[in-house]
C-alpha cells in the first residue's frame, strides 16, 4: 500500500464519470463531499496487499493515527488514489481495504469521510505547509495469507460466535433451553439438539429417498455433479405445481415478478463480501479471461434492479419476486441428502424494500403469516414444523412484545438464538424447520430483516422532501426451496406409514387423482367414458387397461397413493354410476359421477391445475426405474 498524507485546510471532491465498469454504488449525496481542517489520506491499494489485507488495514490505521495525533487532526478524509502505484490490487480487494480503514478510524472516534471508489473525480485541497503537512508511507504485509485462509478465518469467527439458546412460550416466558420441560414438545427437543450440535451429516439414507424412487418422482443423475437430480413426469408435475402455487401466492401478496441472470461477475464490487464468505461453496464459470459465479440466491439480480430503479416513499413497501431455477451451492458431499440438501435447487425468493424498521417489522409479521398459509396449502401445519427466531440481545430488549407476538401466532413454544452482537447482515430472522425421520432439520420458510445490503448495493428511495434515504430490505422465501417442500411432504408421509396410516399427497398435488379400473374388456368403453368426463372436469385420471387381475390392479393403485380408485363393471355401466374406493377414509361407496367430480373439485378449489403427466392408458407407459 502507498499512502500520501496531507494536512489540509480543506479537501473537496466532485464525481465526474465512471473509471471502472462496475464502480462502487453511490447516492446523489455521495457525488460531492468536503471536510475542513482535515488529514487527507490518498491511498493506492497494491497487488501485494491481496496476500494479507487485514494486516495492511491494521498497519495503515496505525500509521494514520500516528500522523493524526502529531498534527492534532480530528477529521480524516480517505481518498482512493490509483496513481501512487503501477501494481494495483483487484478492485474488490481495494474497496474492501478502504472500507475497513474507514470503519476502523470511525470506531476510534475520528470524523471520517471516504471518497467513492471507481470514479474519475475533480478535487481541491489547501495544504497547510508545515513540516508534517506532507508525508508518505509504504506498507507491505509481512505474512502472506491466502484468500482461502482468510475465508477459513471468517468461517471460524462465525463458528466461534457465542449463541445463547432459549425457549420462548406463547405466554412470553423466556426459558433457558437447559431448563425447559420438553414434555409434549418432543419434536422441538429434536430440533434443539440438531441446532446446537450442528451435525449436518446423516449416517443413513432418509426415508423420503426410498419413496421418491419407489414413486418414480425423482432420481439421482450419474451424468451430472452430485446434488443435481433428474425428475420423472410425476415428480416434474408435483414440482411444477408447487412452483406455480408459491408464485401465485406471492404475486397475490403484492410482489412484482422479475427474472435475473444465473451468473455474476466476481469483480463486481458490491458482491465481494457475499463471495468471500463461502468461496468453496460456489460454482465458478469462466468466460474468456473473466470469472463468474453461479448465483446461490436471487438477491444479486434483484438488488441490482433496485439500485437502478427510481423508488419513491409512495412505492414502499416495494416487493420483488423471482423463482430461481436454479440456485447453486457446492454443498459438502457428506451433507448431500436426497431432496433435503442439494447443489442445484429451485428457490422462491422475494425481497421487500421497507422505509424503516417499523415498516420492516410490519412486513416481517405479514410474511410470517404468509409463510404459514403457504405451508398449510402443501399439507404442512404448525404441528409439522418447528420455529427458530434469531436476533441480538439489544433487539430483544427493544422489541420483546413483537417477538412474543410471533410465538403467539404460531401457538406453541419456539427456539430462540440470541447473540450479544450482530455478526450477520440481518437483525432479525425466523425459519420454519421440518424435522425428519432421522432427526435432521431443514429450513423451509424464512424471512430476514437486512440492514447492510441496501447501502452496499446503493439502493435508495426518495422521501417526502425529495431527499435520498437508505431503506431496509427483507429477504423472504415463503416455502423454502421447492425440493425441500417435496422432501417434507414425503418425510411426513413416511412418518404416517410408520404409524400404519396410508400415505397420501395433498389431492391437488397427486399426479393421478383418479384411477379407473374396468373389471373386464367388455366395460372398457364405459371406463374410457368415465375417464373422459373426469378429464373434461380438469381432474387427472388414468385407466388401467393391463391384463392384470382386479386385485393386482387395485394393489398397484394403492402403491401409487392414488386418492380415488373407481372400479367399473357391468352393474355400474347399466346404472351409469361408479364404485369409488376413497383412500383418505378407506370407504368404498357407489355414487353418481357428478357427485365425485363435485367432491374432488371442492377439495382442489383455489389450487393450480396441470394436466395428467403420463399417457391415459397404463399399457402405454414406460417404466422409468427397475
UniProtKB/Swiss-Prot annotation:
Signal peptide, first to last residue: none
Q: Where in the cell is it found?
A: Cytoplasm
What does the record note about the cofactor?
Answer: Binds 1 zinc ion per subunit.
Annotated region (Editing domain), positions in chain: 1-145
What cofactor requirement does the entry state?
A: Zn(2+)
Any one GO molecular-function label of the UniProt entry: ATP binding
- For this chain, the annotated S-S bridges are none
Q: Which Pfam families match?
A: HGTP_anticodon, tRNA-synt_2b, tRNA-Thr_ED
List the SUPFAM superfamilies hit by this protein, alphabetically. Class II aaRS ABD-related, Class II aaRS and biotin synthetases
Q: Which UniProt keywords apply?
A: Aminoacyl-tRNA synthetase, ATP-binding, Cytoplasm, Ligase, Metal-binding, Nucleotide-binding, Protein biosynthesis, RNA-binding, tRNA-binding, Zinc
Gene Ontology CC terms, in alphabetical order: cytoplasm
- PROSITE patterns per the record? AA_TRNA_LIGASE_II (PS50862)
Which annotated residues bind Zn(2+)?
299, 351, 475
Under InterPro entries, the record lists: aa-tRNA-synt_IIb (IPR002314), aa-tRNA-synth_II (IPR006195), aa-tRNA-synth_II/BPL/LPL (IPR045864), Anticodon-bd (IPR004154), Anticodon-bd_dom_sf (IPR036621), DTD-like_sf (IPR023509), Thr-tRNA-ligase_IIa (IPR002320), Threonyl-tRNA_syn_edit_dom_arc (IPR015011)
Superkingdom classification of source: Archaea
One Gene Ontology term from the biological process aspect of the record: threonyl-tRNA aminoacylation
HAMAP family, A to Z: Thr_tRNA_synth
**Description of its domains:** The N-terminal domain is an archaea-specific tRNA-editing domain that hydrolyzes incorrectly charged L-seryl-tRNA(Thr). Catalysis of tRNA editing is performed by the charged tRNA itself.
Relate the protein's function as given in its record.
Answer: Catalyzes the attachment of threonine to tRNA(Thr) in a two-step reaction: L-threonine is first activated by ATP to form Thr-AMP and then transferred to the acceptor end of tRNA(Thr). Also edits incorrectly charged L-seryl-tRNA(Thr).
Its quaternary structure? Homodimer.
Q: What is this protein called?
A: Threonine--tRNA ligase
Its source organism is Thermococcus kodakarensis (strain ATCC BAA-918 / JCM 12380 / KOD1)
Instruction: Tell me the name of the encoding gene.
Output: thrS
